[in-house]
Amino acid sequence: MKKTALTYLLLGGILMSSGCDLVDPTEVTNPNLTEEAILNTNNPMTPWVAGVKRQLALTVNAHVTFLEIGSDNYENVQTFYNQNLDNLTIRPQDADINGFQFQLGRLREMADYGLTVVKNADPLTTADQEAELNFYKAYSYLLSGEYFSFLPVTAGGEAVEWRSILGMAVETFRLAESSSNTQISAAASLGIARANYRLGNKAEAVQAANSAISKAPNLVYYAQFDQAQGPVNTMQTALYDRGNFDDLQVLPRMDFLDPKYYFRGASQASPVAIFKIEEAHLILAEAAISDNNLNSAKSVMTDIVNLVGSRERSTFNNNQQDRTQLNPGSRPNNSDVQVRFSPGAPLIEGLVLDRKSGNVTVPTISGTSVSVADVDALNDLDDALETLYLMRQEIFIAEGRRLADMGIKLVISEVEYLANPNIDAGSPGTSPVIPPFIDSIKDELDAFDYDAAAGICTIRHNINRILVENKTSELVLPFH
């Protein structure tokens, strides 16, 4: 009924406008830009792959910023970005959710079109180009399975359950592993590990993680942006380029990691890592903890600390960032501040930067507050697991990854189910998934108490500890 009514409304609008002296854009054609003309150009696969790679950047832009807002990583203190996710108000009408779903579908369909239509039209298509397109297609499946409980994987198709979608990601990443490009092959192996990790397939995840490490022990695979020609990095805009609007304020215990992205020049935007080898080691460490092998886990965690310590750090001016602009004295803004991860927890120094006293130095690939000494001191499996999830949070900050670790899944967009005859408002996937132990504190995910005079900041909820306390839930910590 809803679709019929919508159709009549659209038809009515078309009929009403048909009497006006307007140019119908659908009647304007360029004979040089038809599908046939483009496919008949020399080697059309090369520009097509470049276009799909650009779509990868658009897909990253479509999810990283608003998913970071939804997590405990950042609080949105302005109105420019998503106003719902900060308190986990997840609705089918959300424009960002619709945009994310649209860009996922576009990435998948563009890759698929290249693998079928463009490939058949271009005899010069290489095996590496096919592998790269399969990599992008698999990444679309991976994000779909990580962030939606159900989602269509074909245009107008039925909604598919997330486990099945992640299975599709695994199979498609396998097709990309054959690439002679080590970065793509290793990233595909890591994609297989990541999908199997989320599925709880420990043996398969460990095997793929080890494969990725052996191929590229320092792997970082980026989505690239272009500051001059676009697309620009939306998260860079939110964290840095909008200057003293200060839209996204980081949780104080991760102040030293912010901003991961900054202005690098008129033609150079900060890239976003979508795969990096740290994740393979994190998977191996969590597998060891789930096997009750604390010593093995500590060994891997030490490797992670050392790897992170070797990663690039950038020094730049960030004095336009004002932690207390809207409410003076409300947020830590100098390096003398000590931070507790929860009420009663030990005070920790060195987590907050001075931004008004000169340049700051920030990790731009991975960073962590965990030291080798911290790892050496671990003598309890749950404490090790909490530390590992702290490392995951810190390493993946500003990459749109945290919400999946919190067990949260988005909803099918209203735009999708109004247009798709296979999905209705009450279909599976049209309600969000939020673990009850997160839902009960969703209004305080970013909350902290700050005594500016004493220089002490106390985070109200240690989400990593809460995740560990609920490790047997099927919604979080997949190996437990």
Residue ranges and their predicted role:
Residues 20-68, 414-480:
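Membrane-proximal, proline-rich intrinsically disordered regions
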Residues 93-99, 144-172, 203-207:
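Short coil/linker segments at helix-helix boundaries
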Residues 200, 204-280, 290-293, 298-378, ...:
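Hydrophobic-face positions in mid-chain alpha helices that act as interaction patches
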Residues 1-20:
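Sec-dependent bacterial lipoprotein signal peptides
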Residues 44-48, 81-151, 174-182, 272, ...:
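Conserved, well-structured interaction surfaces
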Residues 108-111, 166, 173, 209-210, ...:
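Inward-facing hydrophobic residues that define packing positions of alpha-helical scaffold repeats
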